[in-house]
Amino acid sequence: MRSAFYISDGTAITSEVFGHALLSLFPTEFEHHTISFIETTEKALAAKERINKATSRGGKPALVFHTFVNNENREIIESCDAVLYNFLEPFVAPLEKELAIKAKPTTHRTHSIHEKSYDYRIEAVNYALTNDDGSNVTNYEEADVILVGVSRSGKTPSSLYLALQYGIKAANYPFTDDDMEELKIPSFLKPFHKKLFGLTIDAQRLIDIRDGRMANSKYSSARQCRMEVREVEKLYKNEQIPFINTTKLSVEEITAKILTETGLQRYKY
């Protein structure tokens, strides 16, 4: 299997994101490797050796997606027996010309703990954990968004992803079996109606998920799952709560759609 490397003298997050995005366009399997914090000559040489071995083992040149601030270490990597893609180089010179200023590359600047976005994200993660699954309903005034939906529709992972990636304070509240007889917005959520965002899911997918968690129970029964999905979607429509179906979406896609629908400010950068 052909190898793909994502490497950097920083976190390698940028290389991973761009590299995976490009490779996802092709119906081919790859053996993925991430090497971060290549900050010394020794580490660069070790990475080069690893890449060359992967090329030799796979029979085809490894693909290397990289971002380097240090020119010497970049040159070592670029001498590998591999096909290389430098994500920064094509854009730096045109930007320098447009901005009329020379770039001053600094490692870790994008993902530094000294950035304000880091503080936003840590605070948002703490908020998401404290306000997960309706465990705390007393401080929704701090929420940027409140995700609602039936159990196992994707509320918790979406809340945490919004917090960790974008610094958005996302609470979430579940509609349970006890709510279904006369489903309505709870009194403590009514003052925050504009913050509500609904998640729904196809009944069959919900059955499959719940069956893996609590097989042969009322909770995972087809009748229960279909009823809950039907009632919660009726509530969304009656109360004009925006909502999306999460059945075929990854957590990245779910949160991207939430951000698009709500227009929430991102604190990532």
Curated annotation (Swiss-Prot):
Q: What is its EC number?
A: 2.7.11.33, 2.7.4.28
What InterPro entries does its record include? Kinase-pyrophosphorylase, PSRP
Looking at its record, which EC class is this enzyme?
A: transferase
- The residues listed in the UniProt record as binding ADP, with positions renumbered to this chain, are G149, V150, S151, R152, S153, G154, K155, T156
Catalysed reactions, as listed in the record: [pyruvate, water dikinase] + ADP = [pyruvate, water dikinase]-phosphate + AMP + H(+); [pyruvate, water dikinase]-phosphate + phosphate + H(+) = [pyruvate, water dikinase] + diphosphate
User: Which terms are listed as keywords in the entry?
Assistant: Kinase, Nucleotide-binding, Serine/threonine-protein kinase, Transferase
Q: Which GO molecular-function terms appear in the entry? A: ADP binding; ATP binding; phosphotransferase activity, phosphate group as acceptor; protein serine/threonine kinase activity
What does this gene product do?
Bifunctional serine/threonine kinase and phosphorylase involved in the regulation of the phosphoenolpyruvate synthase (PEPS) by catalyzing its phosphorylation/dephosphorylation.
Q: PANTHER family under this entry?
A: PYRUVATE, PHOSPHATE DIKINASE REGULATORY PROTEIN 1, CHLOROPLASTIC
Q: Which family does it belong to?
A: Belongs to the pyruvate, phosphate/water dikinase regulatory protein family. PSRP subfamily.
Q: Which HAMAP family does this one have?
A: PSRP
Q: What is this protein called?
A: Putative phosphoenolpyruvate synthase regulatory protein
Q: Which organism is it from?
A: Colwellia psychrerythraea (strain 34H / ATCC BAA-681)
